């Protein structure tokens, strides 16, 4: 799948994972107080769904068989990284991200944040659907709505 992306943005996948109680997986970035959905970049020539499953496993230890895809955003959702932190985010190569969102239902398995030597998250919580848009870092708030 080839997606047309605005210049200066990195293609990214974000996963909204629902548990059996229809609560959403919300993760705290390691060494910060920032919370977000699992997300990550799409490698060059990588299929968007393949990237989503790779990032889901890398970040929260879930496999393809642990989830069911319920919906996928039709459009890319963009957010800008503030200029004062761009050099620290994504190596300063991008002005923001173009995200494709996946709504996933957890059907088996458990979240595992300690799946690699340098995990991106150090804590997670299952939260009501309205919670993330108020708690995410300011520059992502519009994308979460």
Spans of model-derived segments:
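Unchanged
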Residues: 42-138
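Short connector loops at helix/strand junctions that flank enzyme active sites
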Residues: 10, 37, 95-99
């Amino acid at each position: 799948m080839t997606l047309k992306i605005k210049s200066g943005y990195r293609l990214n996948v974000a996963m909204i994972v629902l548990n059996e109680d229809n609560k959403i997986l919300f993760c705290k970035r390691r060494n910060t107080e920032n919370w977000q959905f699992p997300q990550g970049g799409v490698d060059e020539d990588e299929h968007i769904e393949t990237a989503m499953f790779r990032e889901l496993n890398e970040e929260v230890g879930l496999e393809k068989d642990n989830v069911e895809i319920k919906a996928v955003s039709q459009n890319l959702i963009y957010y800008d990284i503030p200029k004062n932190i761009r050099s620290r985010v994504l190596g300063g190569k991008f002005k923001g991200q173009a995200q494709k969102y996946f709504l996933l239902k957890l059907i088996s398995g458990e979240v595992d944040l300690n799946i690699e030597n340098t995990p991106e998250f150090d804590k997670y919580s299952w939260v009501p659907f309205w919670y993330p848009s108020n708690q995410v870092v300011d520059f992502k708030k519009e994308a979460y709505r």
